Amino acid sequence: MDVIARLRHWALARPRVLLVDAPAATTLRWSVEAELDRRGWPLALSPADTDLLVVLGQPGPELAEAVDVLWSQVSEPRYRGDVQRPSDVAVALDGGRAALIRRAG
């Protein structure tokens, strides 16, 4: 493995996560935040600061449109995941991290 690939892998070992929660997804947000704390993954403060965009719950049409605009502002490598149930949290985060590492390749 070359130096650049190692640096990319290291940088994405703890991806910065930006959460977008739909109305009535508070419990789901708590589940995701608890899992992020357990993993030691930081929350992003803006699209420019994120690697992994996670949409919680089912956004309505207006929020979905806003999420698309937000997504367009996230730089590569990036990954967008949707979480509908607390049981999906770990799988979504693991899949997102794996996809980021592949894309950074």
What are these regions (language model features)?
Residues 8-105:
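Cofactor-cradling patches in redox/metallo enzymes
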Residues 1-8:
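Short N-terminal or domain-adjacent regulatory/targeting segments
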